[in-house]
Amino acid sequence: MYASNNTTAFWRDPALPHVESRRACNSRACYKPHSHPTFSIGAVDAGGSIFTGSQDGQAVLANGSLVLVPAGCVHACNPLPDALWSYQMLHLDAQWLQAHAPGLDGDTAAVLHCPLLYAQFCAMNALLFSRAGAEEKNAALLAFLRACVSACADPLPSERKPVPQQLAPVLETLQEQPSASLRQLAQAAGLSPYQLIRAFRAATGMTPHAYQLNAHVNRARSRLQAGTALAQLAHELGFADQSHLQRVFKAHAGITPGRYR
């Protein structure tokens, strides 16, 4: 499937359910800190941006920069102030990636500055958006991932600390009740709301509320691809109304739900 507008295009194919791609041109899209259940690879084509989430903290990305973002890694990438930027973003199913490119299966983002690898990424992504067959596209994707593994002399670093045992009941509650209140979550951990916010942010990089919104957006992505109506989706995810869903989705995904669909 190919869907586009003036600045953004998405590519998906039921024959390749493990991959989704996006292109954005002359965009002003800004993102709140967020995470994906997928492994993501981004490329900056024009303009500059500021990336947060790598082991080196904040990094400035320029034309030709690549960034590898493991599943679950909290990050954000935004254009320089008052500037436009163009970029490409690839999302890969995490289990599929682990099976086919385990060398990329870390948990900390990495920034690469490699002209040859960037050129290969662009060629591979152009092929995804073309009318080539699924086998040819998948072969190009696998070849690019092998090149990524070679370019990363060492596997991606694994520096994410285990979530403290005290927060395990909070994560379990969020799994069972995605819209649980802060008071409910604090009670599950045996902490005050303030203590929970501080401990949860230290462990996950997000406040409990930001974590909930991020999870809602990730659920919305899959539900939108399945054709769920926006009004129904807003109700299912606990948003006040459709407009509330649209605002939150755009803040995390850089595009409205209707355009993502």
Question: Language-model segments: what does each one mean?
Answer:
Residues 1-8, 30-32, 107-109, 135-136, ...:
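Jelly-roll (double-stranded beta-helix
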Residues 2-3, 7-106:
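N-terminal regulatory/effector-sensing and dimerization cores
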Residues 44, 174-177, 223-227:
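Short helix-to-turn junction characteristic of helix-turn-helix DNA-binding domains
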Residues 104-118, 126-189, 202-214:
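Short, Lys/Arg-enriched, Trp-marked, Pro/Gly-tolerant hinge/linker segments that flank
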Residues 182-218, 234-260:
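Basic/polar phosphate-binding segments, predominantly the helix-turn-helix DNA-binding elements
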